[in-house]
Regions:
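Conserved catalytic-core motifs of GNAT/GCN5-like acyltransferases
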Residues: 122, 140-163
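Conserved N-terminal entry element of GNAT/NAT acetyltransferase domains
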Residues: 1-10, 170-182
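Conserved beta-strand-loop-alpha-helix junction that forms the acyl-donor binding cleft
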Residues: 110-135
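Short amphipathic alpha-helix that is part of the acyltransferase structural core
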Residues: 1-32
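Glycine-rich phosphate/pyrophosphate-binding loop shared by adenosine-nucleotide-utilizing enzymes
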Residues: 52-57, 70
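Conserved acetyl-CoA binding element of GNAT-fold acetyltransferases
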Residues: 67-80
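Conserved acetyl-CoA-binding loop-helix of GNAT-fold acetyltransferases
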Residues: 77, 83-109, 132, 136
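Active-site rim helix/loop that mediates acceptor-substrate recognition in acyltransferases
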Residues: 23-49
Length: 182
């Protein structure tokens, strides 16, 4: 796996088409995945590649509502390309960080924001992507490990969202305990 910083020269047409086909509307074109963040004070996006094929995306940006950064925005890993079966495969894949989000997206966002920065993630109960699983399973399990904490509910970008704060040091400490997906 390889994380590549997004830039205008990347050919993501196949990725966008596959995201559209799978119903990931926020990752189905540059306008919805990238351009909507260009008005943020600071932002960056990355594409995850496996064998030179784009298989995932993530964005981080300033989050003035919380005086920090919002990470894991536009997170997408296309089904059928990861070794596990995703969030629904079991508690172990989450708490032992045996998923691409934990092993690639979160560390990349931490590196960009700075390990001591205030970093937040938002989740909701919408059907989009795997939001319900993220909201009901992923973050609550990581909260029990002290890696995230539920902060509050806000209306953000016209959607009711739960804000989770990342404890970057604890997350990285726990991540180092487990093997990396190759």
């Amino acid at each position: 796996y390889k994380m590549v910083e997004w830039n205008e020269t990347l050919d993501l047409e196949e990725f966008y088409q596959e995201a559209e086909r799978r119903g990931h509307r926020n990752n189905s074109n540059q306008k919805s995945m990238i351009d909507c963040f260009k008005n943020e004070d600071k932002w960056n996006a990355w594409i995850l590649y496996k064998h030179e094929k784009a298989i995932g995306s993530v964005v981080a940006h300033t989050f003035p509502e919380m005086n920090g950064y919002r990470i894991l925005a536009r997170t997408c890993v296309l089904d059928g390309v990861r070794d596990g079966k995703g969030l629904g495969t079991g508690r172990r894949y989450i708490v032992e960080h045996q998923n691409l989000t934990s092993q690639y997206f979160v560390p990349t966002c931490i590196e960009w924001c700075g390990v001591d920065s205030d970093m937040y993630v938002t989740s909701n109960n919408e059907e989009a992507g795997s939001q319900r699983l993220v909201n009901k399973i992923y973050f609550p399990l990581l909260e029990k490990q002290g890696e995230f904490s539920k902060v509050k509910e806000i209306n953000y970008r016209n959607t009711e969202q739960i804000v989770w704060k990342l404890n970057a040091h604890k997350f990285l400490e726990n991540l180092r305990k487990y093997p990396c997906i190759k």
